Structures are given as structure tokens and as C-alpha cells.
């Protein structure tokens, strides 16, 4: 086998491979003999058919199969010999493919970029310093009460925090438009669900009042025919309601699965959940900054093949979230996922180089701690821990998580780290949307 390597544009490489004719002919003959030995042919005892007859019947098909197998096998031998690391499947193209002559073919593919980490000392990370305070717990309890609240009709004016039931009819230039009409429509004032000016026009009104308001649809409104249009809404307020919060008692507490200990037990459980959430938020915020700095300091070429693989993964995940099927996923435009896919590949390559350069291996104690921490969110942590320990795939997933965290720790160790005190809500509101 003869091999030459061409460097094309960017990460693309081409191998020119020559395979001696004897190798091809020997492989074709061996396969034809295998067919002659194992298949039945009319007029011949099994295994006694002449090889020339088998070659006449199956020669072309066998040769094509052999060429495919030979190209794949010699490609693998060539990349091992040349110490090349492909980033995706190759494209084969025969150059010379005559019977009795050497096979000459090319294999074109992308390679992984050579990454040399730099600038880790320039990365800046602001570590949040925060804790769950009593006021944070009380605020969360109030949020839970609001979630369990009921609405009661009141003889008061509509204002933020109240809910109104309204009839409305919208029109543009005197003509009603589709979707602009509703009866007994519930609208929570201050929630910002409607277009600008709509809630303002209702504020201060009481049940039984009928009136018109003038509004303008935003330029970025989702309905193309309404973008930027001036509209008039005829509105009738049917009723105004106020939120009635449940009392903070044992009955309320029981709704959250707290059987004993009353309000104090609920507060303790809420605090525990908030502290777990806070710990994860701090970890996420630090990781986010470390990765952002790593990407900023290290621009690398990205193999298109890896981006395509990641786009495929993101498509499948999107289809699963919306209850779709694999065929539907393939129809989703690649542009929806391209930027995120490229980012994932870049981060993966850079973190992989951190792991390699720091010679990191998943720490067993860290893996154990991560599983135990995750298990605390479940009713029976010991059952969850046992499940992980008995499932090798789940353990491997957790080892990968641990290894990534160790890579982040390695980046932080070389970065410029400062600390800043922040409140619980402030920190959680900084978390990016998933």
C-alpha cells in the first residue's frame, strides 16, 4: 500500500492510496470461492460449481463489495500509519479501478484541530458570595401562597395584582380582525401579557364599565398583518377580582407533602431546597464565566463534520421535547441549531484539551459526592444512589460530569478570580435560559 497526504483548505485532508492489484484479485477470488462453496446451483452438487461460472454470475457485484471493504480497511490502516485523527467519515473516490490493475483511490475528510491552550491567566471570574437568608425563605413561602391563592370578586378598581374578566372587540380602520375578539377573558393586571397600552387603558376601571381604548401593535408583533397597526378596542369589564392568599397553617403545609412539624418544617424544607438551588447556581455562574473566557482566549477551527453531528443531536432533542418523531426532526431547519452546535463543539474541544494537558481523570470521590448531592432531591436518596452504582452507563455519565467540573477547576486555578456579594434572587435571575 502506498499513501500520500494532501493538506487542503482548513482542516480538510486527502489521502491518495494505492492498493496492489494482487490484493484486490485475491480478495475477489476468495469471496467467489466462498459463494461457490456455500450456495446451491442448479445442476451441480453443493461446492462443485466451476469458479468461472460463479465469476460470470456474481463477479461484478462481488468486485464492488470487495472494493468498498478494501477502501475502508486501507483507509484505517493509512490513518494509523500517518497518525491522523479524522473528525468525521471520509468520502471515497476511485481514481483508477480497472480489473487486473492497482486500485488507486482518494479519501477526503476533516481532522481535529491542533489546540494549544493559551490565555488562561487572562480569564476573569467573579465568584458570587451569597447565602439563603430568612427573608429569602419568607419570600419563597409567600410565592407558594400566591401559587395556591384563589380569586374573589371585589367592588374595587382594576390595578396591578388584580384580575379582571373582560369582553373586548378589536378593530382596525373600523373593521374587526381575526383573533381580536373575546368574552369573559381573564387578564391579570401587571402581568404584561397584552400589547403596550392595553392594561393601561383598563387600569382604574370598575365592573360594569364600557369604554374604548386606542393602542398600536408593536413592529415585532407575531401576526404579520397586525405589525405596527393602530387599533381600537371596545371593552366591557365584567368583574374585578383580588387574590386571596391561603392561611399559613397545617392544611396549607400538607399540600407540599409535609406531614409533621407544621410551618416550621415547611420552612426548613424550603430552605434546604433553596440552598441546593443556590449551590448549583453558584457553580453554574462560575462555569459559565470560565467557559466564556476559555472560548474568548482560544479561537480554533471547527470541523464541519462535528457541527453536523451536533446539529443532528439538537434536532433529535428538540423533536423529543415537542413530542415529535425522528422524521419530523430531520425537517427542522439546520439554521435553528447551527450557532448552538458550533458553540458546543468548540467548548467540547477546548475542555478536552484542558483535560488532556492537565492529565485529568475522573476522581472517584468527586463522582460519589455528585451522586449523593443529586440524590438529595429525591424522596429516597439511598435508592437513587444504589441505582447509579448498579448502572454502568449512568456511572459513566456522572464520571463525565465530574471530569468536566475538574477541568473547570483547572481553569479557575489559573484565572483571575474576584468575589462579589450578591442576593439570592439576584444570582438566580442571572442564570441563562436552558
UniProtKB/Swiss-Prot annotation:
Catalytic activity: [protein]-peptidylproline (omega=180) = [protein]-peptidylproline (omega=0)
UniProt cross-references to InterPro entries, sorted A to Z: PPIase_dom_sf, PPIase_FKBP_dom, Trig_fac, Trigger_fac_C, Trigger_fac_C_sf, Trigger_fac_ribosome-bd_bac, Trigger_fac_ribosome-bd_sf, Trigger_fact/SurA_dom_sf
E.C. number: 5.2.1.8
UniProt GO BP: 'de novo' cotranslational protein folding; cell division; chaperone-mediated protein folding; protein transport; protein unfolding
GO molecular function: peptidyl-prolyl cis-trans isomerase activity; protein folding chaperone; ribosome binding
Gene Ontology CC terms, in alphabetical order: cytoplasm
Localization: Cytoplasm
Keywords from the UniProt entry: Cell cycle, Cell division, Chaperone, Cytoplasm, Isomerase, Rotamase
Residues in PPIase FKBP-type domain copies: 161-246
Domain-level remarks: Consists of 3 domains; the N-terminus binds the ribosome, the middle domain has PPIase activity, while the C-terminus has intrinsic chaperone activity on its own.
Protein role: Involved in protein export. Acts as a chaperone by maintaining the newly synthesized protein in an open conformation. Functions as a peptidyl-prolyl cis-trans isomerase.
Family: Belongs to the FKBP-type PPIase family. Tig subfamily.
Protein name as it appears in the record: Trigger factor
Gene name as annotated: tig
